[in-house]
Amino acid sequence: MSATLTEMVQPPNRTAPTAEPRWRNSALYFTAAWSGFFVMGVELLGGRLMAPYFGSSIFDWGALIAVFMTALALGYLIGGQLSLRSPSLRGLGLLLIAEALLALPVILFADPVFDALSFSIEDPRYGSLLAALLMFSAPTVFSGMVSPYAVRLLIDNIEKSGQSAGRLYFASTLGSAGGTIFTTF
């Protein structure tokens, strides 16, 4: 990777970024924050929804957290793979729509599903694990897909890829903190 003499002497091109990338980048950071907010909100509300049926012991919270962590990990993996195929804002929007639509069954069917599982599975540890898996894994996988996909959309300069990823995960984690506070206070 040797630079030519002209490249070494010539100052770097310092043109001002256009308005479109600034707007686009802000939208991507907001999207990451929203996704983090969404995950923590659903996770904490999930614990509250499950408590009347399975309790709120360490086993129940452990099952819920394990399902969310596993679903996020799977989403990160799939989102990274998807980002290799023609990434676009439209594609990111479709991930967000899928995330929201897959959360609808939680609102519509959580009580009957939790009720049925609490009666059919004797050990509440396994009932809560299965309940969390059935109700929360699908929307959480799609939530996990958002960040790696958004990172790919942010990166237009490989030298700043770490900075872009760091800022995106900063926004996502702040969103998670906001979702936690909003849901619990």
Predicted regions: what they are:
Residues M1-F185:
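Alpha-helical transmembrane segments of multi-pass membrane proteins
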